[in-house]
From Swiss-Prot:
Disulfide bonds: none
Broad class of where this protein is predominantly found: cytoplasm
UniProt name for this protein: Acetate kinase
Cofactor binding note: Mg(2+). Can also accept Mn(2+).
Enzyme superclass (EC): transferase
Main function: Catalyzes the formation of acetyl phosphate from acetate and ATP. Can also catalyze the reverse reaction.
Recorded name of the encoding gene: ackA
Origin species: Francisella tularensis subsp. holarctica (strain OSU18)
Length: 385
């Protein structure tokens, strides 16, 4: 029985899963968090949950602990490849690829497009090359699914020479999730290919219009900063705000502004909390800024859904996924309430239960589908080896 090790490496965390790509069974899942701090913890979930602590544990320490776990539990001998989630593949990658010196250099070349993500992915790949040298590795790109977005949507209305010399265009993100969820929606609807709008709402948020199974538009742009309001990211703003802040009036540097827009904005910037569960609790207690954050968040989602309706002669479904999309019934309700004029109506009982279909009888289909990026990465990896 072959197994695929799936890795999602962040700046201070590593999420991992061991998956049988043929049966879709998840054999082991786990998370290492707070890497390189005194609170570094690694959690393994298989038949039992195991927690281990690595005070000031490094990335390398985490990978060595992971290898020890795989050896002790007789998994390493069954692993045939490692699949890595990579947020940004730029113009270089329209599909998943085997990792070699050339592809790794191209991933490095995309660091400026995903400065919060790609450096950590590269570090994870390098440690795997050291610790699992015999295993082939595959990069599965969040941007690949969006390579079908037509040029009149992907291009920005700035000087053409500039955009093409420096590969400035809409690349999107969360493509692995959008692809998986749109395919699952098609299966549930018993269609070969579906026409759906997928709203991936979590700490990072994006919306994609999928026509005949292909991405035709998506809310994230050159980088994962564009589009919806997110946990700590601003989403789309007037570009002149950047120039205003950097002016002599305020004197911020480009680095400071970029950090602010990526790490100090969104829900966190509005009300001081980036977790929608905490924001919702505060709003329920009457906190005015938490209420404002929810309204701004919900309005932005509804606005994108409304704008994407132009792509469909017949919409098969609006699909919610991601941590917020799958679990926050109050947020789904708030979003749908703003779309009543377009034929979206919610069944409050079904919504409260997070059923697969949460729409009322005379509405467009509204669905809740759990994403499974790890399984999609495992299957893409299996197909390449």
């Amino acid at each position: 029985m072959s197994e695929i090790l799936v890795l999602n490496c962040g700046s201070s965390s590593v999420k991992f899963a061991l998956i049988n790509p043929h049966t879709s069974q998840s054999l082991v899942t786990g998370l290492a968090e707070n890497i390189a701090t005194k609170n570094c913890k690694v959690v393994f979930k298989a038949e039992h949950k195991i927690e281990k602590y690595l005070e000031n544990g490094s990335y390398k320490d985490v990978f060595e602990m992971l290898k020890d776990f795989l050896v002790e539990n007789k998994h390493l001998e069954k692993i045939v490849a490692i699949g890595h989630r990579v947020v940004h593949g730029g113009q270089y990658f329209s599909k998943s690829v085997l990792i070699n010196a050339d592809s790794l250099e191209k991933i490095k070349a995309c660091i400026a497009l995903a400065p919060l993500h790609n450096p950590a992915h590269i570090e994870g790949i390098r440690f795997c090359q050291q610790i699992f040298p015999e295993l082939p590795q595959v990069a599965v790109f969040d941007t690949a699914f969006h390579q079908t977005v037509p040029s009149y949507i992907a291009e920005y209305a700035i000087p053409y020479e500039l955009t093409h010399k420096h590969n400035i265009r809409k690349y999107g993100a969360h493509g692995t999730s959008h692809k998986y969820v749109s395919e699952q929606a098609a299966k549930i609807l018993t269609q070969q290919k579906a026409n759906v709008i997928v709203a991936h709402l979590g700490n990072g948020c994006s919306i994609t219009a999928v026509v005949d199974g292909k991405s035709i538009d998506t809310s994230m742009g050159l980088t994962p900063l564009d589009g919806l309001v997110m946990g700590t990211r601003s989403g789309c703003i007037d570009p002149s705000i950047f120039a205003y802040i950097i002016s002599d009036n305020l004197g911020w540097s480009v680095t400071e502004i970029t950090n602010m827009l990526n790490k100090q904005s969104g829900l966190l910037g509005i009300c001081g909390h980036n977790d929608m569960r905490e924001v919702s609790q505060l709003a329920a207690k009457g906190d005015s800024l938490a209420k404002l954050a929810i309204e701004i968040f919900s309005h932005r989602v509804a606005k994108f859904v409304a704008s994407y309706m132009i792509y469909f002669n017949k919409l098969d479904a609006l699909v919610f996924t991601g941590g917020i999309g799958e679990n926050a019934a109050n947020i789904r309700k708030n979003i749908i309430s703003k779309l009543a004029n377009l034929g979206f109506m919610i069944d409050h009982q079904k919504n409260s239960n997070s059923e697969t279909f949460i729409n009322s009888k005379n509405s467009h289909n509204i669905m809740v589908i759990a994403t499974n990026e790890e399984l999609m990465i495992a299957q893409e990896t299996q197909n390449l080896i």
